[in-house]
C-alpha cells in the first residue's frame, strides 16, 4: 500500500474552509468538488502510460505520452457525502464509469471506546462489472472506522481489478491502520490523517458530518 498525503497549499486552503463551522452549504459542496478534481489529477499522475509520437498541424512530429489506463476507470461513490467529491473526480476523469454504494451508521448501537464495533448498514449497491483491466477508485471524503470502505473493497476485490485506489479528504489514524493491515494492495489518496474518533464514530478534529453539511 502507498499512502499519498497531499499537502499542496491550495488543497490545505480548501480543507481549512471545509473544517470551519462558518462555511455555508453551497461553499462546502463547491470545495468538495474542487478537492475531488485536484485529487483526480493526482491519481492520473500514477497511472500507466506509454510514449507515442503525434503529428502537429505544421506537419512535424512531437513526442508525447498516452495514458492508456484512462480507458478503464471505475469510480465507486459512497453516498451521500461523496456526491460532490465524485463530481470533482469526474471532471478529471470524464470517461470513468460510475458505481454507487449507500450505507449508514447505526449510531445508537455505538459502544464507547470500541469504534470498530460501529455497525454499518449497506442498503444499496450498484456497481458495473469489474475486469482485470480496471482501475477502481472508491471515493469517500471522510473515512472514520473504515467499515464502509472495507465492505466496498470486498465487493470488488474478487474481480481482480488492475489496481484499487481510495480517494478521501480526511481519514482517521484508526481507519488508515485498519485498511492498511487488511488491504495492503490498496493505495490511498487523502489530504489529512486526523488523530481521533469520538464514540459516535466522528473524526476529530474532522469537519463534522459531511453529508449533512453538504445537503442539510
Curated annotation (Swiss-Prot):
Uracil binds at residues 203, 208-210. Keywords: Allosteric enzyme, Glycosyltransferase, GTP-binding, Magnesium, Nucleotide-binding, Transferase. Pathway: Pyrimidine metabolism; UMP biosynthesis via salvage pathway; UMP from uracil: step 1/1. Binds 1 Mg(2+) ion per subunit. The magnesium is bound as Mg-PRPP. GO terms for molecular function: GTP binding; magnesium ion binding; uracil phosphoribosyltransferase activity. 5-phospho-alpha-D-ribose 1-diphosphate binds at residues 80, 105, 140-148, 209. Its cofactor is Mg(2+). It catalyses: UMP + diphosphate = 5-phospho-alpha-D-ribose 1-diphosphate + uracil. The keyword Cell membrane does not apply. The keyword Transferase applies. GTP binds at residues 30-34. GO terms for biological process: UMP salvage; uracil salvage. Pfam families: UPRTase. Allosterically activated by GTP. Its EC number is 2.4.2.9. It is an enzyme of class 2 (transferase). Disulfide bonds: none annotated. InterPro entries: PRibTrfase_dom, PRTase-like, Upp_A, Ura_phspho_trans. Catalyzes the conversion of uracil and 5-phospho-alpha-D-ribose 1-diphosphate (PRPP) to UMP and diphosphate. Belongs to the UPRTase family. HAMAP family: Upp_A. This is Uracil phosphoribosyltransferase. It comes from Sulfolobus acidocaldarius (strain ATCC 33909 / DSM 639 / JCM 8929 / NBRC 15157 / NCIMB 11770). The lineage of its organism: Archaea, Thermoproteota, Thermoprotei, Sulfolobales, Sulfolobaceae.
Amino acid at each position: 500500500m502507498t499512502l499519498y498525503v497531499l499537502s499542496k497549499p491550495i488543497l490545505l486552503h480548501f480543507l481549512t474552509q471545509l473544517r470551519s463551522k462558518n462555511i455555508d452549504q453551497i461553499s462546502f459542496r463547491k470545495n468538495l468538488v474542487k478537492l475531488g478534481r485536484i485529487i483526480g489529477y493526482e491519481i492520473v499522475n500514477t497511472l500507466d502510460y506509454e510514449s507515442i509520437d503525434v503529428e502537429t498541424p505544421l506537419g512535424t512530429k512531437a513526442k508525447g505520452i498516452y495514458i492508456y489506463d484512462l480507458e478503464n476507470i471505475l469510480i465507486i461513490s459512497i453516498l451521500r457525502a461523496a456526491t460532490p467529491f465524485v463530481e470533482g473526480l469526474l471532471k478529471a476523469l470524464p470517461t470513468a464509469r460510475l458505481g454507487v454504494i449507500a450505507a449508514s451508521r447505526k449510531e445508537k448501537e455505538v459502544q464507547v471506546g470500541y469504534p470498530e464495533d460501529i455497525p454499518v448498514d449497506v442498503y444499496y449497491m450498484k456497481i458495473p462489472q469489474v475486469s482485470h483491466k480496471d482501475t477502481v477508485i472508491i471515493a469517500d471524503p471522510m473515512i472514520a472506522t473504515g467499515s464502509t470502505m472495507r465492505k466496498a473493497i470486498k465487493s470488488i476485490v474478487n474481480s481482480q481489478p488492475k489496481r484499487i485506489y481510495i480517494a478521501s479528504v480526511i481519514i482517521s489514524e484508526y481507519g488508515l491502520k485498519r485498511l492498511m493491515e487488511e488491504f495492503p494492495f490498496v493505495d490511498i489518496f487523502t489530504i489529512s490523517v486526523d488523530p481521533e474518533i469520538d464514540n459516535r464514530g466522528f473524526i476529530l478534529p474532522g469537519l463534522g458530518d459531511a453529508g449533512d453539511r453538504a445537503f442539510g
